[in-house]
């Protein structure tokens, strides 16, 4: 991949809909990449505060906030991590379907064309794209590093539903919040 593609992949991974790493906008990612602080998405989890101190616009406060945000991104659900990998043709909806079907990244890595095609809404183009992604040793290496960093790469088995489960209720979130409605919805339902 060329530099703009690599930067784009990191930007996608850090985005709100994927890993939601606060304080890591497109400009900052491009700067970190150009300065050699990060070369791929796995490098985000090995950033040291010292490596950021020399960079423009990085005071102690913003470094601390960024490191905290990267750390808290490790709690993102499997489908968000899967979406963040940037597999061609795998959007949010497909990532959710894959996570619910394969339950772990290892099951997905070891899947074949038939098992992928059996997933609702996955056609040949998406299935081949997934297989190609996991046949690339660089991608496998990155996934391994992300696993070692502690990201969630499996569906956490749901506890038995309690009688007051909210999943079949309509919940309206109104007002002003620090986090997005999407995040609030995620917290309520999970």
Positions of predicted regions on the chain:
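Cys/His-rich short segments
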Residues: 1-21
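DNA strand-break repair and replication-stress modules
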Residues: 6, 13, 35, 42-43, ...
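Short, conserved phosphate-binding/catalytic loop or strand-edge motifs used
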Residues: 29, 47-50
């Amino acid at each position: 991949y060329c530099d703009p593609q690599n930067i784009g992949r990191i930007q996608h991974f850090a985005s709100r809909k994927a890993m939601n790493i606060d304080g890591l906008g497109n400009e900052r990612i491009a700067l970190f990449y150009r300065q050699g602080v990060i070369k791929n998405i796995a490098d985000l989890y090995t950033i040291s505060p010292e490596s950021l101190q020399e960079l423009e616009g990085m005071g102690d406060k913003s470094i601390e906030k960024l490191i905290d945000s990267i750390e808290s991104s490790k709690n993102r659900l499997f489908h968000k991590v899967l979406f963040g990998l940037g597999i061609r043709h795998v959007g949010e909806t497909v990532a959710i379907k894959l996570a619910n079907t394969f339950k772990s990244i290892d099951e997905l890595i070891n899947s074949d064309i038939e098992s992928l095609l059996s997933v609702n809404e996955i056609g040949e183009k998406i299935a081949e794209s997934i297989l190609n992604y996991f046949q690339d040793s660089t991608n496998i290496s990155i996934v391994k590093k992300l696993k070692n960093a502690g990201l969630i790469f499996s569906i956490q088995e749901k506890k038995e539903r309690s009688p007051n489960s909210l999943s079949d209720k309509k919940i309206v979130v109104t007002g002003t919040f620090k986090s997005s409605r999407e995040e609030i919805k995620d917290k309520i339902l999970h």
